Design a protein with these regions (language model features):
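General "foldedness" signal
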Residues: 42, 70, 85-87, 94-96, ...
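A short, surface-exposed interaction/processing loop segment used at functional sites
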Residues: 77-103
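Mature, folded catalytic cores of secreted/periplasmic enzymes
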Residues: 33, 81, 145-147
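C-terminal partner/receptor-binding element of secreted or periplasmic proteins
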Residues: 93-147
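N-terminal secretory signal peptides
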Residues: 1-72
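Residue-identity detector for glutamine
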Residues: 30, 50, 79, 87, ...
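Generic structural hydrophobic/aromatic packing signal, biased to beta-strands
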Residues: 28, 56, 80-83, 120
Length: 147
């Protein structure tokens, strides 16, 4: 389930994102020259077929920082959302973000890669978590629906 709608920065006490193991992250393709590495924790991927949403934890690692985000992709319409974030090993905090266009002004290129490489099959959510993991690991090129 999505964390309750809380103001950005509010500590989550319920609806916490799933636990993850940084040693198991699936590295996601980044633009050449990027100093940030992004990985998806495969054990956190879940599918809500009724809502058409894939949820997951992404971990961004840079030279001096590590941030994890609990996110979702809504394939039908090409939208994404950050539900919560945490710095290093700190507490999960509500992100205060609504659903946004994957191609909008606040878009993140890696989100489109996730949709393309396994989370979405055209405008539909991929309901097979194992297939999503395989697609992300192999860089599979599924057709992304542009809403």
């Amino acid at each position: 389930p999505e964390p309750a709608a809380l103001p950005a920065g509010t500590a989550l006490k319920a609806d916490l994102p799933p636990a993850y193991d940084e040693a198991r992250l699936i590295e996601i393709e980044q633009p050449r020259g990027s100093t940030v590495r992004i990985g998806i924790a495969p054990e956190t991927i879940s599918v809500d077929a009724q809502a058409g949403v894939v949820r997951y934890v992404a971990v961004m690692r840079g030279i001096s920082a590590r941030v994890a985000t609990y996110e979702g992709i809504r394939c039908n319409g090409g939208q994404w959302r950050v539900f919560a974030r945490r710095q290093a090993d700190g507490p999960w905090l509500a992100a205060g973000m609504e659903w946004e266009d994957m191609y909008g002004p606040r878009q993140q290129p890696y989100v489109r890669v996730l949709a393309r490489d396994g989370m979405c099959i055209g405008p539909a959510v991929n309901t097979d978590v194992r297939s999503i993991v395989r697609g992300l690991q192999s860089g599979g090129r599924n057709v992304l629906y542009r809403g």
